[in-house]
């Protein structure tokens, strides 16, 4: 760029007419040409400096280009008219040359717009007007030529001013493109019908090929499925004889938990039997043997091997050895009905045969109360009760109306009192 003294922000842009007026008076003198040349050289230098930044400074480049073009035109006009004395005559060519300069970009733009419209027409129709050159046709791609003619005809109608509200008009035949090779001259209607027939034939051929391919694929799939089914091995059916051999092999090998499928297959000696089949059958057999088999208890069968009494397991030999001997526990249960209504079954043994247990709590409290009263009352009360108990059998024996059940009840009551007195003595010793 130039120095700061030469460049400033006070520069006001002037129109082209003002520039012409400023230099119109000095065209006859020679220093004017030198001045114009100096300005042109300086502008060109500035343009070269900004050329590297023309994308960032597009307006500056445009201003410099316009100024350079204006000064060039002025310099050429001054040199051409330097011999003329009339200033007005000398300035007229400058104005005539200057006016087209402003309209020149518009012409180029119009050319570009015309080229774009023609390109759109080419891309949307298969025909071209007569005034289009072959060179412009060669610049078009092939994809644009193969587009449908109906769309192009519709677009052409819209450009000519016809809208959608006009009546429908029949399609008109249009001339062919220059690029197409003309082998035969056929009317457009025949070409259209032939094209339709060709398309129909190609579609029919494609459908036939598609059907043939589908049939071939279905046949190949059917053959492959049948071959795969034939190659697939049938599932092994375990007959009773085969299962019997399997069980025998397990017994020889020491059980299902020890035997291996390979050993079982070798012992069974069956043709076509594989290790996988033996393995699957062995797994099913193990699952079947793990299930607990239900054992229904019959009424006439033998008794259980173990007897439960009060949470204690008693071996069966004790029940067989002491099963038939009557005990005091049986009489107490039978006469007083403290625990059950009847005697226990014969295969159960009574608890007092093996260990001594305290009687139920209600009789115990009752006898404690009696002993407490006896001890507080003195020895006379106990002797009186004892004499009453001992004398009662004679009285009962004398009375003919009393039965044997009452005598048994009194004897059981006497034995029970003796047992409770012994138990109370043992409890006293335990307390001390």
Curated annotation (Swiss-Prot):
Any one GO cellular component localisation term in the record: nucleus
Q: Where in the cell is the protein located? A: Nucleus
SUPFAM superfamilies cross-referenced by the UniProt entry: Homeodomain-like
Keyword Hydrolase among UniProt keywords: no
An example of a Gene Ontology BP annotation on this entry?
A: flower development
Tell me the tissue specificity. Specifically expressed in vascular tissues of cotyledons, rosette leaves and cauline leaves. Not detected in the vegetative shoot apical meristem.
Domain annotation HTH myb-type: ranges:
230-290
Pfam families listed in its UniProt record: Myb_DNA-binding (PF00249)
Q: What induces it?
A: Up-regulated by SVP. Down-regulated by high temperature and gibberellic acid treatment. Not regulated by photoperiod, circadian rhythm under long days or vernalization.
Location, primary (coarse class): nucleus
Name the keywords, alphabetized. Answer: Coiled coil, DNA-binding, Flowering, Nucleus, Transcription, Transcription regulation
User: Which residue ranges have biased composition labelled Polar residues?
Assistant: 123-139, 187-197
Q: Which domain of life is it from?
A: Eukaryota
The disruption phenotype is: Early flowering under both long-day and short-day conditions.
NCBIfam families per UniProt: myb_SHAQKYF
Task: Provide the assembly information.
Answer: Interacts with JMJ30, but not with SVP, FLC or CO.
Entry function: Transcription factor acting as a flowering repressor, directly repressing FT expression in a dosage-dependent manner in the leaf vasculature.
Output this protein's name.
Myb family transcription factor EFM
Report which gene this protein is encoded by: EFM
């Amino acid at each position: 760029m130039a120095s700061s003294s030469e460049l400033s922000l006070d520069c006001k842009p002037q129109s082209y007419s003002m520039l012409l007026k400023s230099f119109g008076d000095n065209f006859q003198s020679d220093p004017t040409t030198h001045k114009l040349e100096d300005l042109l050289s300086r502008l060109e230098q500035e343009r070269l400096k900004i050329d590297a930044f023309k994308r960032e400074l597009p307006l500056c480049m445009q201003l410099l280009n316009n100024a350079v073009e204006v000064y060039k035109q002025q310099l050429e006009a001054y040199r051409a008219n330097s011999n003329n004395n009339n200033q007005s005559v000398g300035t007229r060519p400058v104005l005539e040359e200057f006016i087209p300069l402003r309209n020149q970009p518009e012409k180029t733009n119009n050319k570009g717009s015309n080229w774009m419209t023609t390109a759109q027409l080419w891309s949307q129709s298969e025909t071209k007007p007569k005034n289009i050159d072959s060179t412009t046709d060669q610049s078009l791609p092939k994809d644009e030529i193969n587009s449908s003619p109906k769309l192009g005809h519709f677009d052409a109608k819209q450009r000519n001013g016809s809208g959608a509200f006009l009546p429908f008009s029949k399609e008109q035949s249009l001339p062919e493109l220059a690029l197409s090779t003309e082998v035969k001259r056929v009317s457009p209607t025949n070409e259209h019908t032939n094209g339709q027939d060709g398309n129909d034939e190609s579609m029919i051929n494609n459908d036939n090929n598609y059907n043939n391919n589908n049939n071939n694929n279905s046949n190949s799939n059917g053959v492959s499925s049948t071959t795969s089914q034939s190659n697939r091995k049938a599932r092994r059916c375990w007959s009773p004889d085969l299962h019997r051999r399997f069980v025998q092999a397990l017994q020889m090998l020491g059980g299902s938990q020890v035997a291996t499928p390979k050993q079982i297959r070798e012992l069974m000696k069956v043709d076509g039997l594989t290790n996988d089949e033996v393995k699957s059958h062995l797994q099913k057999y193990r699952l079947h043997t793990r299930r607990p088999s239900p054992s229904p208890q019959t009424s006439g069968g033998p008794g259980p091997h173990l007897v439960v009494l009060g949470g204690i397991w008693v071996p069966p030999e004790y029940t067989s050895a002491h099963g038939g001997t009557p005990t005091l526990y049986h009489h107490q249960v039978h006469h007083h009905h403290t625990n059950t209504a009847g005697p226990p079954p014969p295969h159960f043994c009574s608890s007092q045969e093996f260990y001594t247990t305290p009687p139920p709590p209600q009789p115990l409290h009752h006898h404690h109360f009696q002993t407490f009263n006896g001890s507080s009352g003195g020895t006379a009360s106990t002797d009186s009760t004892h004499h009453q108990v001992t004398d009662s059998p004679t009285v009962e024996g004398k009375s003919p109306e009393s039965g044997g059940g009452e005598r048994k009840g009194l004897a059981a009551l006497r034995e029970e009192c003796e047992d409770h007195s012994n138990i109370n003595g043992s409890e006293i010793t335990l307390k001390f």
